Amino acid sequence: MRLGITCAPPHQTPAEWAGKLSSLGCRACVLPCDETTPEDVLEGYLAAARDADLRIAEVGAWSNPMSLDPETSRAAISLCQRRLAFAERIGAACCPNISGAVVGAGGQWDGPFAANYAPETYGRVVATTREIIDAVNPVRTFYTLEPMPWMIPDSPEEYVRLLRDVDRPGFAVHLDIANWIHSPRRYFGYREFVDECFRLLGPSVKSIHLKDVVLQGHLTTHLQECPCCTGGLDLAHYLRRASELDPDTPVLLEHLPDYQAYVESLARVCALC
């Protein structure tokens, strides 16, 4: 596996960017560029990543294809297609998004809504995922959906079903097990759940997010995401299972408030390896 962070360190040049990441022990990264970046700037970052042996882990396409607002949905699908094409161009491991929230304009794009589980929603997720992939037909990268606690896919079994029903070689798995820790049983049975995720999804995993969770002791159930190695999850076990995948599989830390927090959290994770 290749550890990395989603945060770009403060830098003035691509070489400085890559050098700082390497000095932290990173071997995976997120490029601080997108499809609108000038060609010469993009090439500079790509060269710096190659020289530092940094694998580009992902090109995020974070948007809401499931929006009930047609304009928002169309814009999201278009963004996903552009980002997937960019991921294909630069050879990123994957292009992740969420399936999306079934909500009108102005609603929380990644939020919990009953309609996320409506019978017709699953079919829409399959159809839009195909539409995104078929516009690009990637061969070097994959479109992926991030696991979520309150939308499709909310379990490894549902992700297996999606892989079958989308039925595209350009569709694969981005694994973020922390997002599936949505009950005390899952929290306390984390090691067994991790094993089940890797048993069902391991061959299709193209990238991983690494996060921690703490179960707080007040009513009602409150599971809070927290920096790695400060919660109750056995991240060493997660990393051991990740190390059994393709050795170039990226494992990224995310959702931390600033660069220094990433530095400190990554140091704790490296100590587990």
Regions found by a protein language model. Give the residues of each.
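Acidic-and-aromatic substrate-binding clefts and catalytic sites of carbohydrate-active enzymes
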Residues: 7-15, 31-44, 64-74, 103-105, ...
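Aromatic/hydrophobic pocket-lining residues that form the small-molecule binding cavity
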Residues: 14, 42, 76-80, 122-125, ...
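Short, electropositive alpha-helical surface patch
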Residues: 111-119, 152-165, 223-241, 261-273
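Short amphipathic alpha-helices and their capping/turn segments at secondary-structure boundaries
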Residues: 39-51, 80-91, 156-164, 192-206, ...
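Acidic/histidine-rich catalytic cores of soluble enzymes
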Residues: 59, 127-227, 232
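N-terminal pre-domain/capping segments
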Residues: 1-93, 119, 130, 172-175, ...
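Short beta-strand segments at enzyme active-site cores
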Residues: 31, 57-59, 93-101, 141-146, ...
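Active-site acidic/histidine proton-transfer and metal-coordination neighborhood
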Residues: 19, 51, 70-173
